[in-house]
Swiss-Prot record:
CDD domains named in the record: RfaE_like (cd01172)
Keywords: ATP-binding, Carbohydrate metabolism, Kinase, Multifunctional enzyme, Nucleotide-binding, Nucleotidyltransferase, Transferase
Classification via HAMAP family: HldE
Family note: In the N-terminal section; belongs to the carbohydrate kinase PfkB family. In the C-terminal section; belongs to the cytidylyltransferase family.
Protein source organism: Pseudoalteromonas translucida (strain TAC 125)
The protein's annotated pathway: Nucleotide-sugar biosynthesis; ADP-L-glycero-beta-D-manno-heptose biosynthesis; ADP-L-glycero-beta-D-manno-heptose from D-glycero-beta-D-manno-heptose 7-phosphate: step 1/4; Nucleotide-sugar biosynthesis; ADP-L-glycero-beta-D-manno-heptose biosynthesis; ADP-L-glycero-beta-D-manno-heptose from D-glycero-beta-D-manno-heptose 7-phosphate: step 3/4
UniProt-annotated stretches for the region Cytidylyltransferase: 346-479
Reactions mediated catalytically: D-glycero-beta-D-manno-heptose 7-phosphate + ATP = D-glycero-beta-D-manno-heptose 1,7-bisphosphate + ADP + H(+); D-glycero-beta-D-manno-heptose 1-phosphate + ATP + H(+) = ADP-D-glycero-beta-D-manno-heptose + diphosphate
Name of the protein: Bifunctional protein HldE
Binding residues annotated for ATP, in chain numbering: N196, L197, N198, E199
Cellular compartments per GO CC: cytosol
Length: 479
């Protein structure tokens, strides 16, 4: 995965078209039953309004730093005014079209003790005449965008979606659709559709086996003239299916608080990552991580680049890929962690043959803060320090082993004869909050200590485990 593309999220120029909604939340305590009917009485203590539907897709894109526009229909009412006010506070080029004869789609949820008690929907279905207003506006703004996302909640805004997709494809745009209709032919020409499992079944998809699922998905997209399907499968994760390939992505193991808007997060993240230049497979990997974050929050939630960066770091750690992360990307991840208020700890060493002393030492170092960065001497550096017969294990293998430890967040190679094989320059680049060194050093003897102290950090010396050293391990093996 090319993590450098995460710096390029603002390159995505995305237009969201579809059913915009106002999500309203009324929070309160429910300690008694109504004397009028056998229903709970909720004493409302807090009101909250959020952008929903297609507006939530646009909000997700904006929060990921994508350049986004929004087309949708609202009524000439209070709900429309509130929704426009919410969107004004976001980095969204909002172009909502007001109609006088129908209300703004609004969903009011009563929440008590983290549970939804009831939902009230205020809506009427928009007609083709209303949809024509969006089609006309789409034609005017199409040249400003590279990706077009259609968010279909079957509320009528996209009654003319076939015409809209045709218009977008003729203009050379990449089209993504979050579908609601079971007739996938309505989305002919789309590059990606993102149905959930229930929508897939209603469209004729088979789920009895993985082979049957893939076969039926390929038939559906082939018949409908669609390039690929990203099937969201709840606890089974996601599957990206095209005519020749199928990639499966496991669901993220997080506590699910609310699945509201999870599909919005998926298609928004997919569009942003594709716009940044990622491959479809990598873009879906990131979208899967974003969905895991979103469902752990209450309500239609968004995901920030910082949250995504942290989750990506955990994911790469779990898959054993993070030791291969380019240096500039590691620095960016560290900076995100700092912005989130996390304490960065740094230590360094050769770690030629990992032993119990190393493991305990690294765990103690990690306990000093939130994230641990390990500077790892490269092979040439170790040879200069330890002799021509060292290292025993090459850099890549040492980095892989260290990266498998839960205490280690990032491994960064270093070592230059010009710098006396110390990590001083690396420490200046990272500027950790805490610098840890093992052994009987004084603070004055520790490379990089002066920089850390000068910038308000701390320096600590930890004791090594008696009887544990790489030299002793090598000696014992030779015996």
């Amino acid at each position: 995965m090319d993590l450098s593309l995460l710096k390029n999220l603002s390159a995505a120029r995305i237009l969201v078209v579809g059913d915009v909604m106002l999500d309203r939340y009324w929070y309160g305590d429910s300690g008694r039953i109504s004397p009028e009917a056998p229903v709970p009485v909720v004493k409302v203590s807090k009101l909250e309004d959020k952008a929903g539907g297609a507006a939530n897709v646009a909000k997700n894109i904006a929060r990921l730093d994508g350049k986004v526009g929004l087309l949708g229909l609202i009524g000439e009412d209070e709900g429309g005014q509130i929704l426009e006010g919410i969107l004004e506070g976001e980095k969204i080029n909002s172009q909502l079209v007001s109609v006088c004869d129908l209300p703004t789609i609004s969903k009011m949820r009563v929440i008590s003790r983290h549970q939804q008690v009831v939902r009230l929907d205020l809506e009427e279905t928009f007609t083709e005449q209303h949809s024509q207003l969006l089609l006309n506006r789409l034609e005017l703004v199409l040249d400003e965008y590279d990706f077009i996302v259609f968010s279909d909640y079957n509320k009528g805004s996209l009654s003319l979606i076939e015409n809209m997709i045709s218009l977008a494809k003729k203009a050379g745009k990449t089209v993504l659709v979050d579908p609601k209709s079971s007739d996938l032919h309505l989305y002919r020409g789309a590059d990606y559709i993102t149905p959930n499992l229930n929508e897939f079944k209603l469209a004729g998809g088979q789920t009895d086996s993985e082979e049957g699922l893939a076969t039926s998905a390929r038939k559906l997209i082939s018949d409908a003239g669609i390039k690929a399907m990203l099937l969201t499968r709840s606890e089974q994760g996601m599957s990206l299916i095209s005519a020749t390939e199928k990639y499966d992505f496991a669901a993220q193991e997080l506590e699910v608080s609310d699945v509201t808007g999870a599909g919005d997060t998926v298609i928004a993240t997919l569009a942003v990552m594709l716009g940044a230049g990622m491959t479809p497979k990598n873009a879906v990997e990131i979208a899967n991580l974003a969905a895991g974050i979103a469902v752990s929050k209450l309500g239609a939630a968004t995901v920030s680049p910082e949250e995504l960066s942290r989750k990506l770091g955990q994911y790469l750690h779990a898959t054993g890929e993070h030791y291969q992360t380019p240096f500039d990307d590691v620095l960016q991840h560290i900076e995100f962690a700092k912005q989130n208020g996390e304490t960065i700890v740094f230590t360094n060493g050769c770690f030629d043959i990992l032993h119990a002393g190393h493991v305990r030492y690294l765990a103690q170092a990690k306990a000093r803060g939130d994230r641990l960065v390990v500077g790892l001497n490269n092979d040439a550096s170790i040879s200069r320090l330890k002799g021509a017969d060292r290292p025993i294990n090459p850099l890549d293998e040492r980095a892989m082993v260290l990266s498998a430890l839960s205490s280690v967040d990032w491994v960064i190679p270093f070592g230059s004869a010009d710098e006396n094989d110390t990590p001083a320059k690396l420490i200046e680049q990272i500027s950790p909050d805490i610098l840890v060194k093992g052994g009987d050093y004084t603070v004055e003897q520790i490379a990089g200590a002066e920089h850390v102290l000068l910038h308000g950090g701390k320096v600590e010396v930890l004791e090594f485990l008696d009887g544990c050293s790489t030299s002793k391990v090598i000696s014992k093996i030779k015996q």
